[in-house]
Amino acid sequence: RSSDLLLDHYSLLPHKLILLGDLNFHFDEPDRHDTKRICLSLHNHNLQQLVTSPTHCLGHTLDWLITHDSDNFITHLDVSSVLPSDHFAVLFSLDISSSMRKKRSATIRNIKNVDRQAFSSEATTLLSEPCPSSSDLASHYHSTLHHLLDKHAPATTRTFPDRPSAPWFHPEIANAKRQRRRAERRWRSTGLTVHKQIFQAHRTKVSNMISSAKTEHSRNRILNATSSKELFSTMNDLLGSSKDSPLPTTFTDQELPSVFSSFFSTKIDNLRKKLDATPSQPTLSDPSFSGTPLSSFTPVSQQEVDKIIKSMSLKTCELDPIPASLYSDCLPHLLPFITDIINISLQTGTVPDIFKTALVRPLLKKHNLDPNDLKNFRPVSNLSFLSKLLEKVVLTQLNLHLSTNDLLQPFQSAYRQHHSTETALLHILNDLLLSTDSGNISLLTLLDLSSAFDTIDHSILLNRLQNTFGIHGSALSWFTSYLTDRFQSVLVKNHQSNPVHLSCGVPQGSVLGPVLFTLYTSPLSHVIRNHNINHHFYADDTQMHDNDKPDNVQALLSRTADCYNDVKDWMTHNKLQLNDDKTEAMLVGTRQKIAQLPTSLSLQLDNTSIPISDSVKNLGVILDSTLSLQKFISSTAQSCYFHLRRISSIRKCLSIEATLKLVTSLVLSRIDYCNSLLVCLPDSSIKVLQRVQNNAARLILLKKKSDHISPLLNQLHWLPVSQRIQYKVLSLCYKSVNNSAPAYLSNVLHIYTPSRSLRSASDPLCLRIPRTKLATVGPRAFSVSGPSSWNKLPLSLRQKPSPSAFQAGLKTFLFPH
């Protein structure tokens, strides 16, 4: 406990950390209890121990050098035995060099000084000219607004020093600094004490003004942020961190767009050639549509378009003719023309050509990957605002058609109301826990697709939309136009590659792309179900799980392998590349059952074998073979301490209100992510996250580590971690009982109906609690833990009329008194 308290303190220090000392136990013996405990604590606090060589004459590693895991300023680490001591010297260098400031050029427009009324008036006049088609109308709209932007806010290029930004600086501070310098010169020329005191007063005044200005500026930016992405950007600005993703250094800025464009295009072309050359047979025929077809899209009113625009995030893309701020200010005048473009597109079944171009930015997949290897980058598409608006209108009508005809797969949780990664994982974990509780072994298999969105075959997709999902007429023509003649260009540092034609795939940055992918892969559910294997989808993430007695583990592996081979054959036939190398498999059971299994087990496929892993990462949650979730908890704590330290480094510039918003968005959101999976875990596991929450509360309120934590949590009105878990589980129970949760969760909860007259018969919302065998396994399943906690709530609380009313009452009920 003392080491945890020490690390709690040092891990949140905003400065570079070097912690040296003789910890008096052997780091070179990883199986020792002390070593395991301190290594886990270091990992949880986002710290690393750098000394790996022996530091003692007896060959043990006793002396440690601890730094933050994200820091890399220690170089040339060495252990030397030249000193006359039984301990060796730990030698290292510090990289504290500073980079030279460079000059940079930027093209800017003075949007603030644009006369909105004059701009809108000219736009209304020029856009009134009739156009024969949706493409002509969209092109005229785009060129007109771009012309007006050049007229009212011409682009200018400026070169200036690349110095740290100081948006908080204002003329009053500049005037105070001049007075301070004047007072300093006077004091240094006279040497009088009274002049020194005057200078010190001016110095204090300037310091206080700068501090207040920084605090007010940071507070306003943070409180006005509307998304986590905006908060991240604000924090990076305050910390002086670079927002740009690392890029290869082996090419010039002018060469990079063409290099990336060629790489991305060649990669997809090679995948398609490989898939086309691989023989395959359809495993099952697609189901036929029976219902009310969608033959045409319904035109929308200006009010409907305005409502959709206000529900969207208005962000500027380089393909937009005017920036988002000008769009927002001029929207009442532009809305009739925008509505006309959308309705002509819907009625004619055509998508304007100008909407079919995407700008692609290469993004490094993980921060620790080599940026000089192009395989470590993924293409991220950016589309114009109007194209996404048109897709949003179509998606609204498409979703209505799909829900009316009940066409969505019940175990597909992506892009659906009331569904999330947490509900998907809760369903999977419920099945695995119940299987383990019954004494069985489960096999969880996670499938990985290579460039899943980019290899979709357009003809197969259109055929499936028509025959399986009942889309005909001009609606089908619209989707045909949407997929035909699409282009993309790569944009890197204001340099753009030539457009490349896309013969397959759907754009990932689009509104419709992910939904079209789920419809494209919908028949895969029938392939897996044909083998009687449980499954769940989340976009392109597919998981299969089956269970059997430990003695039948080989049969379990064989069944899954047969299913996997059929899935792979179906995917190949549908031009999707299943990646064997990244597919993972894990056996799940009690510690005793897992220990009794042979150590050489693997999933044997046609051409390869997949080794059995001890843990897998599924939708952001690390699952282990005993479902203890210790690695997930440790990873969550590590991420939280990283962000707490970043917030700590700018805490002096933040108000309590702004700090609270940052901590809520960046730290508590991680503690709460999928925390319903942690229900009924031992207190020793939960206390790791509770310690994170305690440190977050102290950081917000600027309290010492010795201050009692309960009053601080009460002051912030925060539920402790255990109660936050109960809050999430009970909220999902309420939604399940009231049909506001996925069917796969509602179906595992059942109203209790006693076989004879009992007092509980008077409770219409009492849930049946299934019986379990193992006290540490079965009660953790949602179908057990949910009813157990639900039945303990007052009936008046369970009968609340809405989720918001229930959650408000639930927080009061769970809050420590």
Name each region found by the language model.
Residues 3-69, 119-132, 199, 222, ...:
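Metal-dependent phosphoesterases centered on the DNase I-like endonuclease/exonuclease/phosphatase
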Residues 6-17, 394-412, 435-437, 514-545:
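Active-site palm subdomain of RNA-directed nucleic acid polymerases
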Residues 13, 17, 70-162, 241, ...:
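Surface polyanion/phosphate-binding segment centered on an Asp-His-Pro turn
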Residues 25-36, 451-469, 543-568, 680:
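Catalytic palm subdomain of template-directed nucleic-acid polymerases
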Residues 114-148, 607-677:
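Basic, alpha-helical interaction scaffolds
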Residues 264, 291, 295-507, 546, ...:
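Conserved pre-catalytic core of RNA-dependent polymerases
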